[in-house]
């Protein structure tokens, strides 16, 4: 029975598979002409991600073009914020903008508990449609932002180079920040449960900005809330594989493994063999090709994929980039990544 399940789901569960499954973070996006054409027609990011017909169409674009082993919901980590009472927009070339940044306990106390089915029914609809369309040809992936990263956006009010505002809060008003982080942890766990109930078979949590923390501060402000999300989700959905990604994670890999996740998504600044040596054997790995390599030649992409898969041999491994694919990447190189990933065992031999 298990053989009929999607390759990525079987691999994520730790089953023996014929090759590492392959997908790409941000595989639906600006490097694809078909996406850019749709963006020109619908310039609002929130419309593209919150209109179920558009979100579904965009989610399917890379599947129809490249047949990756995973199809991820086209959305944003900030999508749940309005359901908690925090408005935002995403401005092309400027990134996320928070209308009223959270700076006081009064604002935190006024936040609503998240009811995803009520505030984001479009997410459930899209996930259900994706499952129905792709069947067992690919796994459907859901995702969320982790509490620290969501807090970084809503406290700073936008993307930041140095995170001075939230770090000031962390070190001057830690109780305020912990209250916010706890609210996000409970809400994000609810959101993930909703995604799984709607059709997501594997979920990934992005703590994009946790790499900006020292290891000690990671232990205080990021890891406990990552673990809380994982624990709450595992209580109700113990069999759904859970992936954690942090950009700039080389200094906290061992700490990430203690959060209860099943798979750690590595960025490209750590060698795959070194990461595997540092992580417990029961933890799977995802990654970790440098997205910048996709500006190179197909031969270079193939060689790096072969090296990465060879180094992860014997470990539960999902082939991916070490970050989202970059805007401006030649679309044919995206195709080369998938092609080389799917044929890797023909070149390096079996995984056994």
Curated annotation (Swiss-Prot):
InterPro entries xref list: UROD/MetE-like_sf, Uroporphyrinogen_deCO2ase_HemE, Uroporphyrinogen_deCOase
GO molecular function: uroporphyrinogen decarboxylase activity
Keywords associated with the record: Cytoplasm, Decarboxylase, Lyase, Porphyrin biosynthesis
PROSITE patterns documented for this protein: UROD_1, UROD_2
GO cellular component annotations of the record: cytoplasm
GO BP term, example: protoporphyrinogen IX biosynthetic process
EC number, UniProt record: 4.1.1.37
Domain of life (superkingdom): Bacteria
Pfam families according to UniProt: URO-D (PF01208)
Principal EC category: lyase
Subcellular location(s) per record: Cytoplasm
Site description Transition state stabilizer, residues in chain: 76
This protein's pathway: Porphyrin-containing compound metabolism; protoporphyrin-IX biosynthesis; coproporphyrinogen-III from 5-aminolevulinate: step 4/4
Primary localization: cytoplasm
Positions with a binding annotation for substrate: 26-30, 76, 153, 208, 323
Catalytic activity as recorded in UniProt: uroporphyrinogen III + 4 H(+) = coproporphyrinogen III + 4 CO2
Entry's family note: Belongs to the uroporphyrinogen decarboxylase family.
Biological role: Catalyzes the decarboxylation of four acetate groups of uroporphyrinogen-III to yield coproporphyrinogen-III.
Oligomer and partners: Homodimer.
Protein name: Uroporphyrinogen decarboxylase
Organism for this UniProt entry: Synechococcus sp. (strain CC9902)
Gene symbol of the encoding locus: hemE
């Amino acid at each position: 029975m298990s053989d009929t399940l999607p390759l990525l789901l079987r691999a994520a569960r730790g089953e023996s598979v014929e090759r590492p499954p392959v997908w790409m973070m941000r595989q639906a996006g600006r490097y694809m002409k078909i996406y850019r054409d749709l963006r020109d027609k619908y310039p609002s990011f929130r419309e593209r991600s919150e209109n179920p017909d558009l979100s579904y169409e965009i989610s399917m674009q890379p599947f129809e073009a490249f047949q990756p082993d995973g199809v991820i919901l086209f959305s944003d980590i900030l999508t749940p914020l309005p359901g908690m009472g925090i408005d935002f927009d995403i401005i092309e070339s400027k990134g996320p903008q928070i209308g009223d940044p959270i700076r006081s306990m009064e604002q935190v106390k006024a936040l609503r508990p998240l009811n995803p089915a009520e505030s984001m029914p479009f997410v459930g609809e899209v996930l259900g449609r994706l499952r129905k369309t792709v069947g067992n040809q690919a796994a459907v992936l859901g995702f969320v932002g982790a509490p620290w990263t969501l807090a970084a956006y809503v406290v700073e009010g936008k993307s930041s180079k140095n995170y001075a505002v939230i770090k000031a809060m962390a070190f001057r008003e830690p109780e305020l920040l912990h209250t916010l982080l706890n609210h996000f942890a409970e809400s994000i766990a609810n959101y993930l449960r909703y995604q799984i109930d709607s059709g997501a078979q594997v979920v990934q949590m992005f703590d994009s900005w946790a790499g900006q923390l020292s290891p000690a501060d990671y232990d205080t402000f990021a890891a406990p809330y990552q673990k809380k999300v994982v624990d709450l989700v595992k209580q109700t959905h113990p069999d759904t594989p859970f992936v954690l990604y942090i950009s700039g994670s080389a200094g906290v890999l061992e700490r990430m493994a203690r959060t209860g996740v099943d798979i750690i998504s590595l960025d490209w600044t750590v060698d795959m063999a070194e990461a595997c040596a540092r992580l417990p054997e029961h933890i799977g790995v995802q990654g970790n090709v440098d997205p910048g390599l996709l500006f190179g030649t197909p031969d270079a992409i193939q060689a790096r994929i072969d090296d990465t898969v060879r180094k992860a041999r014997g470990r539960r491994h999902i082939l991916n980039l070490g970050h989202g694919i970059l805007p401006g990447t030649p679309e044919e190189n995206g195709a080369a990544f998938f092609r080389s990933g799917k044929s890797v065992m023909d070149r390096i031999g079996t995984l056994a």
